[in-house]
Amino acid sequence: MVRPPCCDKGGVKKGPWTPEEDIILVTYIQEHGPGNWRAVPTNTGLLRCSKSCRLRWTNYLRPGIKRGNFTEHEEKMIVHLQALLGNRWAAIASYLPQRTDNDIKNYWNTHLKKKLNKVNQDSHQELDRSSLSSSPSSSSANSNSNISRGQWERRLQTDIHLAKKALSEALSPAVAPIITSTVTTTSSSAESRRSTSSASGFLRTQETSTTYASSTENIAKLLKGWVKNSPKTQNSADQIASTEVKEVIKSDDGKECAGAFQSFSEFDHSYQQAGVSPDHETKPDITGCCSNQSQWSLFEKWLFEDSGGQIGDILLDENTNFF
């Protein structure tokens, strides 16, 4: 059950307090102290309820109450506490001991609430305007950031390529001088082509003459061996030598060709002074065969007697092949 309010009792006075009532209440509280508000009306003889006595003391008669306008710090405290606690003005007044809960409530309803609503409306309008104005700027800022990031990535890639190139050059130090030498040779090759073209013919004739001199000496050595072996090889060698001599005569440099031909003619002259002829070349081979035949005469006689003259015919046929 809910307790009925004390103000509804018969004989209780309502309305504003008179100065005489204030003096009676203040003198009683100074003697007994604030508290036990139910006994105050009966003890003082006031025709007021206990609640009215408490509120009159707390909001108007107690010492240290600050009157007048609220400071900026007090306004911020009230706004912050009202957002946290709501309309609990007595709890809010406990954080501001110089202000009463009734004064805080009245000041909130008359000034702070309207002021706060106006500030919120202005802030919302500013936010809307800033959002509308910042939409193209934000897109441009994003595009600029993307462009700057792309440029930075390109720079990074180029720096990486340069670093790779420098690393490859550092790891292969022999490549750089080769490249420089090739560049210098290619630049100087165009200048030296004309000078080298004139000397190329002389070098070619010199090379052919030197190779021919060496080939004539080799042919002379081979001719000596061919003279001992068979006359057929000598004829073929003479033909080869004559054809090579003709080719040398057709060359450009006449002096070197004449010297080579002279060396070959001197070799031929020395060979003729030795008195060697194609008929005489095969005779030493026959004498060697005859000497070998005298050594094996006893064996041949025995074979001739045994085979009935067949060996003699074979030996005569073999000797005829040497002629």
From Swiss-Prot:
Signal peptide: none annotated. Gene3D superfamilies: Homeodomain-like (1.10.10.60). InterPro entries: Homeodomain-like_sf, Myb_dom, Myb_TF_plants, SANT/Myb. Expressed in vascular tissues of leaves, hypocotyl and roots. It is found in: Nucleus. Residues 130-148, 182-200 have a biased composition (Low complexity). The modification S-nitrosocysteine is found at C49, C53. Residues 119-151, 182-208 are annotated as: Disordered. One of its GO terms (molecular function) is transcription cis-regulatory region binding. GO terms for biological process: negative regulation of photomorphogenesis; plant-type hypersensitive response; response to bacterium; response to high light intensity; response to hypoxia; very long-chain fatty acid biosynthetic process. There is a cross-link at K283 (Glycyl lysine isopeptide (Lys-Gly) (interchain with G-Cter in SUMO)). Ubiquitinated by MIEL1. Sumoylated at Lys-283 by SIZ1. Stabilizes MYB30 and is required for its function in ABA signaling. Residues 37-61, 89-112 bind DNA. Keywords: DNA-binding, Isopeptide bond, Nucleus, Plant defense, Repeat, S-nitrosylation, Transcription, Transcription regulation, Ubl conjugation. Residues 9-61, 62-116 form the HTH myb-type domain. Induction: Up-regulated during hypersensitive response, but no expression detected during compatible interaction with pathogens. Specifically induced in the inoculated zone 4 hours post pathogen infection. Up-regulated by jasmonic acid and salicylic acid. Transcriptionally regulated by BZR2. Its main location: nucleus. Interacts with MIEL1. Interacts with BZR2. Interacts with PLA2-ALPHA. The N-terminus (11-116) contains a fully active minimal DNA-binding domain. Transcription factor that binds specifically to the DNA sequence 5'-AACAAAC-3'. Acts as a positive regulator of hypersensitive cell death. Acts as a positive regulator of salicylic acid synthesis. Regulates very-long-chain fatty acid biosynthesis. Acts cooperatively with BZR2 to promote expression of a subset of brassinosteroids target genes. Transcriptional activity and hypersensitive response control negatively regulated by PLA2-ALPHA. Involved in the regulation of abscisic acid (ABA) signaling. This is Transcription factor MYB30. The gene is MYB30.
